[in-house]
Amino acid sequence: MARKIQKNKMWGGRFNTDQDKIMLEMNSSIEFDSRLYLEDIIASIAHAKMLGKKKIISSVESQKIISGLKKIKIEFEKGIFNLDPLLEDIHMNIEANLQKKIGNVAKKLHTGRSRNDQVATDMRLYMRKQCQEIIKKITMIQKELSKKANKYYDFIMPGFTHMQIAQPVTFGHHLLAYVEMLERDKNRFHDALKRINQSPLGAAALAGTTFPIDREMTSKALGFTNPMANSIDAVSSRDFIIEPLAAASILASHLSRFSEEIILWVSEGFDFIELPDSLATGSSIMPQKKNPDIAELVRGKNGRVIGALMSILVVMKGLPLAYSKDLQEDKELTFDAIDNILNSLEAINAIIKKLKPKKENLSSAAQKSYSTATDLADWLVSNLNIPFREAHKITGNIVRYCEKKKIKLSELTIKELKSFNKKINDDIFNVLDAEQSVNQKKSFGSTSPLMVKKSATKWIKKLQNEKK
């Protein structure tokens, strides 16, 4: 019985006793790395073609291996491939199944290859595909944000600092801030792809191989830019996972910030937007409740993305070159992070599509807390040639006066305003209203409706022209 299980192991020849149960359990990764079946088959086909082309195995053997791998691919797609947990991982499961299908010739597939470079190749193919998918979904969200910004370019709302009403802005301007953030996120993934897209295949365990393999051929066949130049680096590095997870963590922080704002905006304290019932849940005890769970879940799940990055960094920080089994920990963390970021992107897109801003509530809130005080100070500088620090002090005194009288800045009389500076004239009322405040903004990138409309139009055009 002890030898029966060992015979199932591709590496079992050197061992005389069975593995302990705990060793089998800890060593198995099939529960989570089975999702790499397609990458593993594609990479193995490229390797088999190269072995045949270089006459390391015969062309007949090469074709037989490739044919068997294609049959396995079909079985996975149909959901009829039986995974054996005793075979540890997806790589050994596929190879063992290939042996059942085509016999001993399957044993030649691993010529000039180790699981070390095999796993690294599969993971690079996986990360490349996932980064491309993330980029697509980011673009999808940017398009929705730009459309909404274009539609609501002149809806006045309060802008905040320290969670206190600060200055009037437009709803469209606020949404476009996230378009800009997401563009930087997208660029980080594009940049990471340059370093992900290098082939470790052929590095073998760590020292390369004595077989006359053609790494350029397999690299090209798999769509990589080039084969990696150092075999030790090829099998031991995981920065090709860490870098996109760092980008994903920054993206997650942006999605979480947006989610937090959605949660605030639908609350009774703000009541800025409305979400449909389809994106909310109720309470098991309070019949009146309509909760923004979708945004709360995004906010919560994105912590796992950041956590995955931290965990992999901790795994890597103490590993000597080249390969150690610690590296198996990268997969489960990575898969969870990628799943969560992709789901979060879908959720945020649904929120943006279906949210409806409440114009009157937004405008009313924008008039509160003396939000045009900065405009008043700027008017004193521009029209009365008062130094800004002095204008700041005068405006502060005016605000204190309004607080005492419980009135808005726009409700002040010219007589009251002149009591603070005799040179103040009726023109000052043009900047005391929130709508006038945003319309007066002139600087590039500002919140004026005209500027927001131009920016939204620019983004809509740019995103339409991007490659899908």
Predicted regions and their residues:
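Glycine-rich cofactor-pocket loops
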Residues: N150-G172, I273-S284, Q288-K289, P320-Q328, ...
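A helix-coil-helix interface module used to build multimeric assemblies
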Residues: A2-G208, I213-S219, S278-S283, D293, ...
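Short amphipathic alpha-helical segments with heptad-repeat character
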Residues: R124, R128-I135, T139, S146, ...
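Acidic, glycine-rich loop-and-beta core segments that form the ion-binding/anion-interacting portion
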Residues: L222-V314
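N-terminal, Lys/Arg-enriched amphipathic/low-complexity engagement segments
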Residues: T210-N226, P449-V452
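Conserved hydrophobic residue
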Residues: I56-I57, F81, D271, I386, ...
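Glycine-rich cofactor/substrate-binding loops
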Residues: A2-A43, N104-V105, Q288-K468
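Generic, well-ordered alpha-helical scaffold segments in large soluble proteins
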Residues: H47, G68-E75, N97, K101, ...
